[in-house]
Swiss-Prot record:
Keywords of the record: Mitochondrion, Mitochondrion nucleoid, Transcription, Transcription regulation, Transit peptide
Subunit note: Interacts with POLRMT.
GO CC annotation, single: mitochondrial matrix
Entry superkingdom: Eukaryota
Family: Belongs to the TEFM family.
Protein name: Transcription elongation factor, mitochondrial
Amino acid sequence: MAWRTNLACLIKAGGRRWFPVPEYSSLPPVLNNTCSVRKSTAPEKRVASVAACDTDGKEPGNPLDRLFSLEQQASILQVLNTASDKELEAFRLLRGRKSVNIVEHRKKFGPFQRLENLIDVPLIQYKTAVEVCNSILCPENRRRKKSQEKWLLRKFIKPGVEQERLKAVKSIVSIVFGTRRIAWAHLDRRPTVLDWQQTECWKLTNKTYPTSFYLEEISSVISKIPKADLYILEKSGLSIQNTSLLPILLHFLITEAMLYALLNKTFAEDGQHRVLSINRNAVGKHFDLMIGDTRTSGRELVKQFLSESVLKERPRVFFPQDLLVQYRQKVVKSSYRIEELYDSLLQAVAFYELVFGKDSELKC
């Protein structure tokens, strides 16, 4: 897409980055539900093992019990008859209502006697039943899924940090900056918004600011930012090939470098990164805010979060009751777009959901 940008117009529009950025490669396809076939001297067992790890070509006319050996059937039935609904949700295809239906079916009709009984459970059809049995027998697939999750974290969150360390954090500060403002959102793992602010720092013009100016301005901002285990910065991904955006790109790089240096106070001592960057478009994809290569405003989504915090027992984000009205007025009644403020909150929520999943509090 050809795109022409006038720097003066960008500044007049309020300083936020309304220009296309290259979309990162799409997520990898879901791994096929396959696993290796162990050699066996018993032909009937080898055939059953193949059936257990390959769902292709199965027809409803082929009863479930014929696809698995007696030993495999016993293993599957043991899980189906003893696991709680929460334990059953560990299997991807049984998340939500299906796991509850299995437990309710057990209570109403007694333990499952045959694998074929699984099809009698509401919402579970033949193909789903076969894949559920496969996933119970092939834990390797779950290990591959965990490996895929680690790959996603390495791809979108940099520099690389051990997953165990990411999952040990108690609070983060998400920071987003533009050509006029710096905004931050301080969230714990619930996630509850502990602090959410923005400050005017500069007006980017055609003149060049000395490095000392950046140091003074950003040091002043950092003095207001709360302490946290990790600081998450937005990585815009602007292309250097668009020469008209070079002044803005340079501004972003200087600001980012200053934040990395000033917030990583103990890096020289322990070598541990406490400042990470997350790709802007990855957050946009996480919340379905992308239209082509361009990320749209997150204002409506933030307003939805504010409403759900009052209306829902388990909202996606919790807001302190004493600050809820203040935040809502700031978002709803603002006469100009404060995109940095919206994006700092969305970035924090996306980080927690990428690391912990949507029910992060339950995994603490």
